[in-house]
Curated annotation (Swiss-Prot):
Catalyzes the formation of 6,7-dimethyl-8-ribityllumazine by condensation of 5-amino-6-(D-ribitylamino)uracil with 3,4-dihydroxy-2-butanone 4-phosphate. This is the penultimate step in the biosynthesis of riboflavin. Keywords: Riboflavin biosynthesis, Transferase. Pfam families: DMRL_synthase (PF00885). It catalyses: (2S)-2-hydroxy-3-oxobutyl phosphate + 5-amino-6-(D-ribitylamino)uracil = 6,7-dimethyl-8-(1-D-ribityl)lumazine + phosphate + 2 H2O + H(+). This is 6,7-dimethyl-8-ribityllumazine synthase. Its EC number is 2.5.1.78. The active site is at residue 91. One of its GO terms (cellular component) is riboflavin synthase complex. The keyword Repeat does not apply. Coiled coil: none annotated. (2S)-2-hydroxy-3-oxobutyl phosphate binds at residues 88-89, 130. It comes from Nitratidesulfovibrio vulgaris (strain ATCC 29579 / DSM 644 / CCUG 34227 / NCIMB 8303 / VKM B-1760 / Hildenborough).
Length: 156
């Protein structure tokens, strides 16, 4: 069988610096996501002093702040954490779509990996499930994704 070169990222955060952009809106959910992300990174070797949390009002502000952090050159990876919960108006669609597109654009323009932990749920129960109960912790999952991507990018 032919050997095919495979590039994979090791889940070792030692020596890396991360910024977490987290919304204040729905903070009782977002605080759990932050806890999951920080716990994951620290369990994988990231020193507490290499983590910076930037609190912002809401999801719409995330792309601008993530882009500024990514272009600062201070961080190996950015993690975006927030919770947008559907209401009775189309506001949910506008905010979640623009935040998602803006975060992807910030990542692509800067070349700095970004972990996407912006919950977009139909109700509060779904958000709670994704912030550390039945559906795991999406903050930890975003941290895992950005860590692995940072380590892959180092090899490319």
């Amino acid at each position: 069988m032919l050997h095919i070169k495979t590039i994979e990222g090791q889940l070792d955060a030692k020596g890396l610096k991360f910024a977490i952009v987290a919304t204040r809106f729905n903070d009782f959910i977002v605080d759990r996501l932050i806890g999951g992300a920080c716990d994951y990174l620290q369990r994988h070797g990231c020193d507490r002093e290499n983590l910076t949390i930037v609190r912002i009002p809401g999801a719409f502000e995330m792309p601008l702040v993530a882009k500024k952090l990514a272009h600062s050159g201070k961080y190996d990876g950015i993690i975006a954490l927030g919770a947008v919960i559907r209401g009775a108006t189309p506001h949910f669609d506008f905010v979640s779509n623009e935040a998602s597109k803006g975060l992807a654009q910030a990542c692509l323009e800067s070349g700095v990996p970004l972990g996407f932990g912006l919950l977009t749920t139909d109700n509060i129960e779904q958000a709670i499930e994704r912030a550390g109960s039945k559906a795991g912790n999406k903050g930890a999952e975003a941290a895992a994704a950005v860590l692995e991507t940072v380590r892959v990018m180092e090899q490319l």
